[in-house]
Amino acid sequence: MTQLHQLISLLHLASPSLPIGGFSYSQGLEAAIDCGSVHDAASAERWIRDNLLHVQAQCEAPLWLLLHRCWKAGDAAQVRTWNDWFRATRETSELRLETEQMGWSLSRLIAQMEWGAPVLRETLAALSPVCLPTAFTAACVALQVEARDGLAAYCFNWAENQVAAAIKAVPLGQVAGQHMLRRLHCAVLDTVDEATRRADATPPQLSTFSPMLGLLSARHETQYSRLFRS
């Protein structure tokens, strides 16, 4: 597959139009807005950048790389192990249901689009529940997208969803959101680099320590007025 074909596949996977429901989640951002921790463009950008560098880069992003390697090697047992491990690290019911719903939607799409070899689709279908990183890495391997490229798209898509949530809930203007997203480019690249370092370590250096995110997510479950499901 040529680099251009890989780029098109990557754009497809990272598209906001991918029908997996990412737009309906804020991952604690709405609760941070409700309690006043996020209240303008600067605080929203700080929240998203810190989440990328100190949460995503330490757990989900390196795990994403490990899953990509497992799919590429055809190691179904290790795929299941990492999928179950990631699900167990979701601290609240909202965060757990988020990754399960999006993972299920993407795995169903992979089956309907017939992406990848039958054995990949069968392995994915056998996982229940399936988490989003597991399904997304399966799609990348099926479409021959390289690991770091796929992770960069995954992290950018996450940041894009966070900016969209901030625009709706703070609220912010569309241009302010685009300025914010542009300034987050370097944070996305730094996240990929840190995730690579952690995934390459022996054993892999994964950290799920994010107490404020867990508390805000738990608070969001009983928040009086909500736009988002997390």
Swiss-Prot record:
GO terms for cellular component: cytoplasm. GO terms for molecular function: nickel cation binding. The keyword Ribonucleoprotein does not apply. Keywords: Chaperone, Cytoplasm, Nickel insertion. The keyword Ribonucleoprotein does not apply. Gene3D superfamilies: Urease accessory protein UreF. Its main location: cytoplasm. Pfam families: UreF (PF01730). It is found in: Cytoplasm. Belongs to the UreF family. UreD, UreF and UreG form a complex that acts as a GTP-hydrolysis-dependent molecular chaperone, activating the urease apoprotein by helping to assemble the nickel containing metallocenter of UreC. The UreE protein probably delivers the nickel. Required for maturation of urease via the functional incorporation of the urease nickel metallocenter. This is Urease accessory protein UreF. It comes from Cupriavidus necator (strain ATCC 17699 / DSM 428 / KCTC 22496 / NCIMB 10442 / H16 / Stanier 337) (Ralstonia eutropha).
